[in-house]
Amino acid sequence: MGRGSGTFERLLDKATSQLLLETDWESILQICDLIRQGDTQAKYAVNSIKKKVNDKNPHVALYALEVMESVVKNCGQTVHDEVANKQTMEELKDLLKRQVEVNVRNKILYLIQAWAHAFRNEPKYKVVQDTYQIMKVEGHVFPEFKESDAMFAAERAPDWVDAEECHRCRVQFGVMTRKHHCRACGQIFCGKCSSKYSTIPKFGIEKEVRVCEPCYEQLNRKAEGKATSTTELPPEYLTSPLSQQSQLPPKRDETALQEEEELQLALALSQSEAEEKERLRQKSTYTSYPKAEPMPSASSAPPASSLYSSPVNSSAPLAEDIDPELARYLNRNYWEKKQEEARKSPTPSAPVPLTEPAAQPGEGHAAPTNVVENPLPETDSQPIPPSGGPFSEPQFHNGESEESHEQFLKALQNAVTTFVNRMKSNHMRGRSITNDSAVLSLFQSINGMHPQLLELLNQLDERRLYYEGLQDKLAQIRDARGALSALREEHREKLRRAAEEAERQRQIQLAQKLEIMRQKKQEYLEVQRQLAIQRLQEQEKERQMRLEQQKQTVQMRAQMPAFPLPYAQLQAMPAAGGVLYQPSGPASFPSTFSPAGSVEGSPMHGVYMSQPAPAAGPYPSMPSTAADPSMVSAYMYPAGATGAQAAPQAQAGPTASPAYSSYQPTPTAGYQNVASQAPQSLPAISQPPQSSTMGYMGSQSVSMGYQPYNMQNLMTTLPSQDASLPPQQPYIAGQQPMYQQMAPSGGPPQQQPPVAQQPQAQGPPAQGSEAQLISFD
């Protein structure tokens, strides 16, 4: 940071204050001096200025850019290295994109353009030139460039040189001889050769620092030269014809000496008159410019044309080489006449009001009252510009405008310049100023113009205050507009948040409604599921009830006593894969299939089934007395059709399917009644050869007559099968479709030949044969 960091920060805050109305050059120059003399490091200073440049307030940013411009122009290479790099250029480009203030944007463009022109011959600062070219390609409009803006006075203190001996006396450095550096030339010296201290203005070092003796002498010689140069003639005198005259005093003869004596006498007289006039002037000054009044009265001064219009006095000593312009100032009679007229004219003690005073708009400033004071009579009075309006050209009481003001200032400047030149000329020639009437007359003329000059200064101060007030009002308006813009932005933000909140509430309500509808849907689905479960339970209950009823029916059948069943109506049918009964009922009831669990044969059905029915079929009815005891054993487990003869157990069904195997219950005592009866012989039906496979056989439906049975003769109808019985007839022509088991080999089913083609291998059965019974159970 450096030793002067606190001072630097204070000066930087002062130079970039937002309360400034114009640039504070004094603080900026002090900042430059701190950096140049090394009290503040260049890197720290540039970083601090960058922070001010990035400030939100555009006034602070603009003043910070002014500080950066001055630092770059006055502080040399150390600052150039910190500013003319890629990081700083990128920061300025970003600031240009973000900044909306026109003045700040123009200042950034102006600085980049000036730096690009100043560093165009420096290869290490080429990034500035590249940035300038890129911004031109991007379309940025740079302000008008003046080459004088890129003139940098970059003188800085030289770098210190390191060595082992003194640069002047060549003494080796050691423990007792320390190294010292001269701040002016940068060389290394011993303590004796660098014992002087001096300021170095060209490097901005205003405090006394250690320098070597040659540099000290050089700096002091320059200081003495500057002190003597203050007495040199100004450029106005050097360009005038008076400067071309010979400055050596001419050779004096007797005539010249006499003229000199007369001149001295005239000067003495003029001095006495001047003293008297000085007393009168002081009195008039006290009355015309009271200390309590802020606006002093103005006095009219003779214009430049009136000073040169009088004829030249022939008695005045003039040489041929004297300028005629100077001769006019040496006209004593003219100035004496002017003094007499000034004494006769009264001096007003009160200000003279104007007929139409100029109104001062705004700020409550009152227009100053113009007072005409004529210490020297003249034909034309000089204008006194009042403070006019801000949008119109200021008018004076005599109708003259700013041009008269400029003429007055030009005449005053010429009078002062001539007065100074005359004083210097007298000094160089060794003349006494008190004896020079031209100097006295010029002094009186300038003294008469002085009050009017003060009046003009007061008016300018009032106008400055007025415009400063306008600038304050503009700043207030700008701040008010900024506050209004902020309020509008805040209002828009509030509306946007309210809209977002309303949208969020609407989304929440929609989500709640959707959740309620989902819950209702879930409840509806749950109710439907419960109803479906309830229906399934009811169906299951009904099925269980039916199963219970069937079980009860089966139990009732098992518990009912057996009744004798006449077998005369039964027709023996062969079992082909199952047992099928073809009852011979009434014509209105065709033969049906009775599965397991059927209710046929129950007492309820026995009422109808017990009615006699005509026998249907080609075979006669079987007498009930021809029962054979061995027929009881021919009971097939599945309900199906029976044949005329009972087949042996090996021929009852195919062995491929155990589900169709014949069930052979043990004969009981209940079947003895049936066995005691003699069965009726049936016609012999040839039995076809047994096939290893069972197939589906379709033919014409044949009604077979049988005696209906009931629960009482159920047990008696169950046949018993014996090994001595003939084999069961497997097929009868004209029977309903039968189901036979398919062969495992997948071959086509073998169809039984019709009855007409079957050989009559068997004759009618014997008297002792038993008829085969069919079970519907």
Swiss-Prot record:
Component of the ESCRT-0 complex composed of STAM or STAM2 and HGS. Part of a complex at least composed of HSG, STAM2 (or probably STAM) and EPS15. Interacts with STAM. Interacts with STAM2. Interacts with EPS15; the interaction is direct, calcium-dependent and inhibited by SNAP25. Identified in a complex with STAM and LITAF. Found in a complex with STAM and E3 ligase ITCH and DTX3L. Interacts with E3 ligase DTX3L; the interaction brings together STAM and HSG, promotes their recruitment to early endosomes and decreases STAM and HGS ubiquitination by ITCH. Residues 454-572 are annotated as: Interaction with STAM. The modification N6-acetyllysine is found at residue 207. One of its GO terms (cellular component) is multivesicular body membrane. Keywords: Acetylation, Cytoplasm, Endosome, Membrane, Metal-binding, Phosphoprotein, Protein transport, Transport, Ubl conjugation, Zinc, Zinc-finger. It comes from Homo sapiens (Human). A zinc finger (FYVE-type) spans 160-220. It is a peripheral membrane protein. Residues 290-311, 753-768 have a biased composition (Low complexity). Has a double-sided UIM that can bind 2 ubiquitin molecules, one on each side of the helix. Changing residue 266 to Q: Strongly reduced ubiquitin-binding. Reduced degradation of ubiquitinated EGFR. The modification N6-succinyllysine is found at residue 551. This is Hepatocyte growth factor-regulated tyrosine kinase substrate. Residues 15-143 form the VHS domain. Involved in intracellular signal transduction mediated by cytokines and growth factors. When associated with STAM, it suppresses DNA signaling upon stimulation by IL-2 and GM-CSF. Could be a direct effector of PI3-kinase in vesicular pathway via early endosomes and may regulate trafficking to early and late endosomes by recruiting clathrin. May concentrate ubiquitinated receptors within clathrin-coated regions. Involved in down-regulation of receptor tyrosine kinase via multivesicular body (MVBs) when complexed with STAM (ESCRT-0 complex). It is found in: Cytoplasm; Early endosome membrane; Endosome, Multivesicular body membrane. The modification Phosphotyrosine is found at residues 216, 308, 329, 334. Phosphorylated on Tyr-334. A minor site of phosphorylation on Tyr-329 is detected. Phosphorylation occurs in response to EGF, IL-2, GM-CSF and HGF. Ubiquitinated. Ubiquitinated by ITCH. Residues 480-777 are annotated as: Interaction with NF2. The keyword DNA repair does not apply. Zn(2+) 1 binds at residues 166, 169, 190, 193. Residues 258-277 form the UIM domain.
